[in-house]
């Protein structure tokens, strides 16, 4: 099943196997050609960063063959946010508090803008020696910061890695529920902020929407915002339902404006991944 029908050799000494593997790895690093031998190094744990709500947003999955490189675009969580904190973790759990912090750095100097507008590209690069380099770049200004994480400082032992993998399997259902709750909360909050900006920003609908419709949206948004602040323990289903209730009020008003000359583009619903995860 695991060796394409071939019978594995059970007669080799374990110590010899380690020695053979080390010799092969040395040859690969030195660029020597090895006939009929393929030895692949992989990432022992998933690598990612923390996003809003303490979510572990994965960039490089566990067992990815190295060297490897992966980029993903993120944005800001607050209006006029001047900086983002990049916290790098390894682990398999849904929340970063249950994973292992490898390092962190701050990218500052982000020009004032509404939340979700700045584009921050985060790139993870793992070289053939397992050294991780993380860089964050503000695509608007070109400013960037980074960090290099080596294998000899602050990394987990083999036993700790195995424990993290076992814990991820043990708490898989609990982690799934936690992730769904945080994502549902973020979706509702994003929609609330999007609707507020839409009816108050002159570049969007402020000059096109009727006063009564604007007040209807703002009233529904305030009710949802108050509910969210007073129900921090709400589960994902309650959060999703609250989002649907808010959309039921806002979307017909927005849709009504489509047919007007110079009307707006369609507004996304709260459960769509409009831009990117927020930092």
From Swiss-Prot:
Keywords: ATP-binding, Chaperone, Endoplasmic reticulum, Hydrolase, Nucleotide-binding, Stress response. Residues 257-279 are annotated as: Disordered. Pfam families: HSP70 (PF00012). It is found in: Endoplasmic reticulum. Its EC number is 3.6.4.10. Residues 24-123 are annotated as: Substrate-binding (SBD). It is an enzyme of class 3 (hydrolase). GO terms for cellular component: endoplasmic reticulum. A motif (Prevents secretion from ER) lies at residues 276-279. It catalyses: ATP + H2O = ADP + phosphate + H(+). The keyword Transmembrane does not apply. Residues 270-279 have a biased composition (Acidic residues). GO terms for molecular function: ATP binding; ATP hydrolysis activity; ATP-dependent protein folding chaperone. Its main location: endoplasmic reticulum. The chaperone activity is regulated by ATP-induced allosteric coupling of the nucleotide-binding (NBD) and substrate-binding (SBD) domains. In the ADP-bound and nucleotide-free (apo) states, the two domains have little interaction. In contrast, in the ATP-bound state the two domains are tightly coupled, which results in drastically accelerated kinetics in both binding and release of polypeptide substrates. J domain-containing co-chaperones stimulate the ATPase activity and are required for efficient substrate recognition. PANTHER family: HEAT SHOCK PROTEIN 70KDA. Belongs to the heat shock protein 70 family. Endoplasmic reticulum chaperone that plays a key role in protein folding and quality control in the endoplasmic reticulum lumen. Involved in the correct folding of proteins and degradation of misfolded proteins. Acts as a key repressor of the unfolded protein response (UPR). Interacts with PK4; the interaction is disrupted in response to stress. This is Endoplasmic reticulum chaperone BIP. The gene is BIP.
